[in-house]
């Protein structure tokens, strides 16, 4: 499967916001959201709630990535409400979301290339699942060690 999810390593992120700045430079509006100072990226959901809820079918899939058709969008905001992480938003009467720079014909998203701290990775769903499992095992090991110490 092609890489299609941007993952942020918060331990490497220095909050320089180069990812946000390059996105704004390329697209005119940064599609990277910032929550409590942390960049938030669209997860490019397989069964995207934003696409499913759109009453005018303004969100379509291109190479498995949800894309907003700005001509069809009526800025009702249903997509923004449906997004589980708040990655899609309405501004200037149209919905905006990360497209992994597909709309500007880039192979690698500009934000990933701009991140000098290498805090951003473009990964496949399978790789993300493996990363989650590794993290889960690491946390479980720490918890077991702490439990032994407290006995």
From Swiss-Prot:
Pfam family, one: Fer4_11
InterPro entries: 4Fe4S_Fe-S-bd, 4Fe4S_Fe_S_CS, 7Fe_ferredoxin, RnfB_subfamily
Positions of [4Fe-4S] cluster 1 binding: 13, 16, 19, 115
Transport listed as a keyword: yes
Cofactor binding note from Swiss-Prot or TrEMBL: Binds 4 [4Fe-4S] clusters.
Residues engaged in binding [4Fe-4S] cluster 2: 23, 98, 101, 111
Cofactor(s) for this UniProt protein: [4Fe-4S] cluster
Residues annotated to bind [4Fe-4S] cluster 4: 54, 73, 76, 79
Alphabetized UniProt keyword annotations: 4Fe-4S, Electron transport, Iron, Iron-sulfur, Metal-binding, Repeat, Transport
Ranges for domain 4Fe-4S ferredoxin-type: 4-32, 33-63, 64-93
SUPFAM superfamilies per the UniProt record, alphabetical: 4Fe-4S ferredoxins
Residues the record lists as binding [4Fe-4S] cluster 3: 42, 45, 50, 83
GO molecular function: 4 iron, 4 sulfur cluster binding; electron transfer activity; metal ion binding; oxidoreductase activity
The keyword 4Fe-4S belongs to this UniProt entry's keyword annotation: yes
Protein name in the entry: Uncharacterized ferredoxin MJ0155
Organism: Methanocaldococcus jannaschii (strain ATCC 43067 / DSM 2661 / JAL-1 / JCM 10045 / NBRC 100440)
């Amino acid at each position: 499967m092609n890489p299609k999810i941007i993952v942020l390593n918060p331990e490497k992120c220095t909050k320089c916001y180069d990812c946000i700045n390059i996105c704004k430079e390329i697209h005119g509006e940064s599609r990277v959201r910032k929550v409590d100072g942390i960049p938030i990226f669209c997860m490019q959901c397989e069964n995207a709630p934003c696409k499913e809820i759109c009453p005018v079918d303004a969100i379509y899939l291109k190479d498995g990535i949800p894309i907003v058709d700005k001509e069809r969008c009526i800025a009702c905001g249903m997509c923004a409400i449906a997004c589980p992480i708040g990655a899609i938003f309405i501004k200037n009467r149209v919905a905006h979301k990360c497209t992994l720079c597909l709309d500007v014909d880039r192979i690698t998203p500009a934000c990933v290339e701009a991140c000098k701290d290498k805090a951003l990775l473009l990964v496949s769903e399978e790789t993300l699942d493996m990363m989650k499992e590794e993290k889960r095992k690491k946390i479980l090991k720490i918890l077991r060690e702490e439990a032994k110490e407290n006995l």
